[in-house]
Amino acid sequence: MKQNKYEIDMCNGTIMDKLISFSLPLMLSGILQLMFNAVDIIVVGRFSGSQALAAVGSTTALINVFTNLFIGISLGANVLAARFYAAGKDLEMSDTVHTAVTLALVSGIVMAFVGLIFSRWALELMGTPDDVIGQSALYMKIYFLGMPFFMLYNYGAAILRAVGDTKRPLIFLVISGVVNAVLNLILVIMFHMDVAGVAIATVISQLISCILVLRCLCTSKTSYQLHFGKLRINTVYLKQIFQVGIPAGIQSTVINLSNALLQSSVNSFGSTAMAGYTAANNIFGFLYVAVNSVTQACMSFTSQNYGVHKFKRMDKVLVDCLIISVVTSFSLGCGAYFFGSEILKIYTADPEVIRCGLEILSYTTVPYFLCGIMDLFPGALRGMGHSGVPMILSVIGTVGTRIVWIFGIFPHHRSLAVLFISYPASWMLTIIMQVTCFYFVRRKVHRV
């Protein structure tokens, strides 16, 4: 199949260089998405104070809980589209695209209503302090108004990734990211809108990225061209999207529930610790983007090669992804550890907030490469269409360990250090289970 200048041929030629070409724009795209939240945090931390910083930061885990089920389902669309595109099945590819975009629109509207109705209740359930809950609820409600744009962008970008195009989503996010940063400065510094201002800026930037990705799909002149008149759900392909996407979404949602539980434990230390965790958690986000971009590459490459029955090439994809992920995440983790104080000063000038952030970083950044290894094997399995068992193992290993830690160990040794040691402990246990699962599934594929 003829490739356009943005696409990558995942099924032929060398692998390592193509993985890097695929992953690097995806990594930069993820960083830009994080910059939406990072700019929010930096601007409110510098110009609106520690309470506003804590208010914005305390919403992160909750927003992820609400949205990650549907974002996980977009992985199902990515896997199915990659498989059809590699096999040259144009009609099936078109039906998948229109089903995915329709699903994104519906889920975005549903999430907007859910966020507007349940934001404050969920924040109260997490024990958000009275001095920040009003601002937190306001930020969440405005943020969720932009959920249809957020969903449409993510599902559209998933289709582009399926055909090997990670460059145009990066361009779209550069444009919307610049708009976000400029609007933050205008609305917060000039108009003193505080958390409402940064939320409005984020929604507008999401609208712009949504328009750009939809325009790209509508003008593509390929099997993945989008026609608004054809928007409808094909139940056959919706079922296949759900088979891969729902377990991935449930896994992400449940893991973020455990993070929300951890956030509630941090809340018990007060707004200073909350602000420190907010800044540290944003740094975690940048580390996760590095490992997640490689996982996305592994899933897309595996799916296309699985679609054309190049099983030995799938193994080489996994090995090369492991090398890239470990080297990248270990290097970045060490950088975050050794330069943690300087990085945290970008977010806040409060020395107590910086101290709390450093305590959290000291136990989580260097071993972050374990998180990368933990995510790669489920990514490869999803690329082969196996999503249920990896989801169960991730929930048991990651969430189970953290729940036992929070309720069994933390109450007897109340400190941020003890709380966050649960991260590397859960990663190690999950790796053991996921590698074992991959070994048995891969043996079955080899026999096919």
Regions found by a protein language model. Name each.
Residues 12, 16-35, 39, 62-69, ...:
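Residue-level signal for short hydrophobic patches within transmembrane helices
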Residues 65-68, 180-185, 210-214, 286-289, ...:
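Hydrophobic transmembrane alpha-helices of multi-pass small-molecule transporters
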